[in-house]
């Protein structure tokens, strides 16, 4: 972990696990903003469901972006609701959230180049709809204006349609690995999480 540019424990890799949970992720959004304020960084980050989206904004260095999605965009017609369900078949508008708003020409774009340039390893958990097993995407699975890895991580059954990506179909990562601490330990043999 880096705090104000200095490694707190020499030669020790650190990780950040950000769970999902819908609107309760507004809390983790505030924590991630505080990490940005204090210049706290991690070697490895993994997010699940809404936590994967929060982690992406954190790695992009976009303080306040996550909060806008929980407060400002929440009442927009394409975001979520019964009308959205009747119009699109989905309660949560993943395409609206992670394309219309998030793309480079959207109302609240994510700084994709900053994610790529961030030295932290980043994984996002999704659930393979055929096997029920977790799948771990990386930032290499994302491209500018193609955030299907995040959408797959957030595709809560019944509330959203599954996401087709890389010749597979995926649901929310919380179904298969809701708090991926063991993945973090196994991935980098981390000591501090």
Feature locations, PLM:
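Patatin-like phospholipase
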Residues: 1-48, 56-192
């Amino acid at each position: 972990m880096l705090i104000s540019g200095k490694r707190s424990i020499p030669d020790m890799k650190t990780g950040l696990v950000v769970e999902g949970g819908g609107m309760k992720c507004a809390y983790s959004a505030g924590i991630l903003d505080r990490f940005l304020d204090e210049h706290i960084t991690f070697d490895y980050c993994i997010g699940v469901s809404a936590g994967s989206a929060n982690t992406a904004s954190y790695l992009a260095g976009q303080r306040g972006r996550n909060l806008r999605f929980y407060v400002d965009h929440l009442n927009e017609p394409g975001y979520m609701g019964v009308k959205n369900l009747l119009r699109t078949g989905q309660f949560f508008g993943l395409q609206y959230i992670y394309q219309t708003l998030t793309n480079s020409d959207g109302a609240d774009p994510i700084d994709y180049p900053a994610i790529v340039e961030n030295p932290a390893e980043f994984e996002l958990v999704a659930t393979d709809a055929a096997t029920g097993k977790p799948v771990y995407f990386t930032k290499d699975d994302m491209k500018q204006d193609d955030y299907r890895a995040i959408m797959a991580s957030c595709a809560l059954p019944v509330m959203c349609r599954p996401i087709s990506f890389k010749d597979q179909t995926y649901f929310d990562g919380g179904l298969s690995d809701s708090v991926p601490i063991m993945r973090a330990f196994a991935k980098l043999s981390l000591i501090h999480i």
